[in-house]
């Protein structure tokens, strides 16, 4: 029975690590969900290269929602930005990886 409990805890931990935790967003619901899914896809696809993940997110956001999107991905950064209203998403993915996506033209 102890082995079964251990596997369940491990599965719960893995699910928590792959679920995006939104820290702040002022995006409309539909845009926020789409952007979250894009961030998860990019971070999983380029798990060892944050620069490539950020480039994928930026280029996709530019195509879908117009130009002037910016993306920062990393594990240790602070930020103070100017952004357009209803165009900011800040989330954590994988436990420690932070993603900030915003539009500023």
From Swiss-Prot:
A GO term, aspect molecular function: identical protein binding
Top-rank taxon: Eukaryota
InterPro entries (UniProt xref): DLC_sf, Dynein_light_chain_typ-1/2
Subunit structure: Consists of at least two heavy chains and a number of intermediate and light chains.
Full protein name: Dynein axonemal light chain 4
Family: Belongs to the dynein light chain family.
Cytoplasm keyword on record: yes
Gene name tied to this protein: Dnal4
Keywords of the record: Cell projection, Cilium, Cytoplasm, Cytoskeleton, Dynein, Microtubule, Motor protein
Gene3D superfamilies membership: Protein Inhibitor Of Neuronal Nitric Oxide Synthase
CDD domains: DLC-like_DNAL4
Cellular localisation: Cytoplasm, Cytoskeleton, Cilium axoneme
One Pfam family from the record: Dynein_light
A Gene Ontology cellular-component term: cilium
Function in brief: Force generating protein of respiratory cilia. Produces force towards the minus ends of microtubules. Dynein has ATPase activity.
An individual GO BP term: microtubule-based process
